[in-house]
């Protein structure tokens, strides 16, 4: 009996043609760390990594500097890095009532740590009520985190209007694109998104365990990196390198 897979909101299947072969080829023919030495295979690995960063910036309309594309284990890690790296006790965070637990649970942890959290209401279709959302913004509002699209309701949020409101008030906007990336085109700069968090295993048709975020300089300045360790750069220093992408260490 032929099986028809309908759970693509959880993870895509089958993956895009060539994904499995590309992974196999990399493991068998390259398979080394980036930035750890100067022999040919490490140069090939570095070039592959740089190329993916450039592709991500083009795909998401993030500008031309690939160092602002940071690799993580997926959208959950990316959202945690942004939310917990940008917010401090006394700050104010706004999320919507439609958020996935990848946003709602970090928000709950941050609230317990002294960050004020507001939940912006949505209408019966799950669309953000823009006027009520804007009224929640205060002088202490530092970050807004919103999902772009929902795999529960099918709602696509009016991200351009949300971005315009945030920019008008000088508030950073981070977007959970888990259910949007790969499904439809969008431009971070035009939408005034400061950080776009993505995962590889849904609409981008890649494997599980990969993802990241692409950000602008405003978000970079706001972030305190949460993870420290070896980067293959400035190894004599006990401080993390100040430059991107090594500053935001995960899978650099």
Where do the PLM segments sit?
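Pyridoxal 5′-phosphate
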Residues: 1-250
